[in-house]
Amino acid sequence: MANIGDGISAKMAEKFFASRGHGVLSLADDNDGHGVPISYGYDLETGRCIMQFVLDTASQKQQFLEASDTVTLTTYEYDADDTWQSAIATGSLVSLSSEDVANWAAAIFFTNAANVETAVRQEASETVIEWYELEIESLTGRENLGDERTKTKFELDQ
C-alpha cells in the first residue's frame, strides 16, 4: 500500500508554501473545474499571497475567476514515490486596485514568485493584466520523506 505521507505543522506548511512560488490554482464554475498553472508570491511576514493573471480573449480564466467563490492553490515538490512534500491553500480571490499593486502587491509578487519573467515576456497588446490576492482561510501540508527520514530544512528552522 502506498504511503500517503504525514501531516506537517502549520509553520512547516507555510514555509514550504512560501518557498515554492508556483503551483496550480483550482477554480470552478458550477460543476466545471479549471486548473491554472500559476506563479505566486507569498510573504511570510504578512501572510499575503499575490498572483498576476495575464488574460486574453480566448482564455477561460476570466469566466472561472468570476464564478469561483472558494479556490485552492496547490504546490508540491516530488523527488520519488516515497519522497515528496505538498501544501494546499484554500481561500478566496480578491481583485487588487492599481494603487495596491503599486504600493505593496507587486513587490511581494516579484520578490517571491517563481518564473515571473515568463509572464512579463509573454505580455502582448491583446492581453489584460489583473492582480489578485488569495485571502487564505486554511493552509495545510503533507510530506513523505522515505524510509531514511531526515529533518527537512523547514523542520530545522523551527
Name each model-derived stretch.
Residues 44, 57, 77, 95-97, ...:
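Non-catalytic surface loops within mature trypsin-like serine protease
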Residues 13, 58-61, 101-106:
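Amphipathic alpha-helical interface surfaces
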Residues 1-19, 152-153:
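Extreme N-terminal tail/first-helix region
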Residues 17, 64-65, 108-109:
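A generic structural signal for nonpolar/aromatic side chains embedded in well-ordered alpha-helices
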Residues 7, 19-24, 114-116:
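Short Pro/Gly-enriched beta-strand edge/turn motifs at strand-loop
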Residues 2, 82-158:
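Charged, gly/pro-rich active-site loop segments
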Residues 53, 57-87:
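Helix-adjacent hinge/juxtasegments
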Residues 20-57, 73-74:
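Short beta-strand segments
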